[in-house]
Regions:
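Conserved catalytic core of the tyrosine transesterase superfamily
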Residues: 1-62, 66-374
Length: 374
């Protein structure tokens, strides 16, 4: 059976006729190869696998020792070092790193793969689990969104979009070629807001991703958008979801019509290379970083806080739908959250909305007291 099961000790290591030069390094490499095979068999994405393996290599270099020598204090020192440097990692990243080390140790200590028996015979020591509840960061939903991240107010959004639109008009009037990329960015940011998209989801949109909503014919072919690159879970790769166009954001339909059937998109010389919704000046599709940089430049130009990034448009979508009276379960489905608690973290309703809600509840209670049978 040796070597036939993904992740099992390879035959080359257990063959007594094959000597092990620099045994510790070769065995560690084989362990990573086995873990990689196991994760592939589980259907994880190659990017997730690559990142996890690179982290374990980094951890090994930090300790200067190998898995059968690792102890809980090693992971304590590693994570503490990452949290105390000039650029400390976030709690979310810290949790991801500790989980990766824990999963690797779980793989090594599983009797089905034979690493414990092999290491005891070869090195006189065995791998053990070094990550426990008492030395791993606890997961609480409240730390999923940084404290500085919030929604845009409607006034801030109006100010931002007005600035970008005015900039497009000025560049066009001056005969500058910059007006077209600026117009593309303007439409892209509004689409991002009007559908509550993540940056990658927005960037990866194609023309074919839009379709009609049979129950709302007024929106034509822009009644819904099929999001094909939604955030996956546990390294499973992109998920899909359908986001409906809602009345509060139906102004985006005219924006999309102007961009597509209105011929604006086709003015890019690269437009015919693919069906990407957002072609760039030199390539078939815009990059994630380019949209982020363009948004940051516009935000800084109007003097908005730096913590208001492109992703905050998604927070704003959630908040403004809740303020408009949409059911929380519908909003959760629209943005593709697995848990309602995550949607709750994205919501930062205004004080006016809170006051109106309280006043409505007071008025309802007074009405019930005056007419109990009503």
């Amino acid at each position: 059976v040796s070597g036939a099961v993904p992740g099992f000790v390879p035959r080359m290591l257990v063959d007594p006729d094959i000597g092990l030069f620099r045994a510790d390094e070769r065995v560690f490499t084989a362990m990573l190869d086995g873990w990689r095979a196991q994760m592939l068999a589980r259907g994880l994405t190659t990017q997730t696998i690559k990142q996890r393996c690179q982290l374990l290599e980094r951890f090994q270099r930090f300790t200067g020792e190998f898995p059968w020598q690792w102890r809980p204090a090693d992971v304590d020192d590693f994570l503490a070092d990452l949290r105390s440097g000039e650029k400390p990692i976030s709690l979310k990243t810290l949790r991801s790193y500790s989980n990766a080390v824990a999963m690797f140790c779980s793989y090594l200590t599983h009797p089905g793969y034979g690493w414990g028996e092999f290491c005891e015979r070869t090195f006189g020591d065995i791998p053990s689990q070094i990550c426990f509840e008492w030395n791993m960061p606890r997961h609480t939903t409240d730390d999923a969104v940084p404290a500085k991240k919030r929604s845009f107010t409607k006034a801030e959004l109006q100010r931002l979009f007005d600035y970008i639109d005015d900039l497009v008009d000025r560049e066009y009037a001056a005969g500058s070629k910059r007006w077209l990329p600026l117009f593309r960015d303007s439409v892209a940011f509004k689409v991002c807001y009007a559908y509550g998209l993540r940056r990658r989801e927005m960037t990866m949109l194609d023309l074919e991703d839009f379709g009609p909503n049979p129950h709302v014919s007024d929106y034509g072919r822009f009644g819904a958008v099929q999001v094909r690159f939604a955030k996956g879970t546990a390294g499973s790769g992109p998920r899909r979801r359908t986001v409906l166009t809602v009345p509060e954001f139906d102004w985006v339909v005219d924006q999309l019509k102007t961009w597509t059937v209105g011929g604006m998109r086709q003015q890019f010389p690269t437009a015919d290379r693919s069906s990407a919704l957002w072609p760039s000046e030199r390539g078939a599709r815009m990059s994630l970083g380019s949209f982020g940089d363009a948004f940051a430049a516009a935000r800084d130009a109007v003097g908005l806080p730096q913590e208001l990034g492109l992703h905050c448009l998604r927070h704003s979508y959630v908040t403004h739908l809740i303020e408009a009276g949409y059911d929380a379960a519908f909003v959760q489905t629209q943005v593709g959250h697995s848990y309602a608690s995550t949607t709750g973290l994205y919501t930062s309703v205004s004080s006016d909305f809170k006051q109106k809600t309280v006043q409505q509840m007071i008025a309802r209670r007074i009405a019930n007291l005056e007419d109990p049978d009503a």
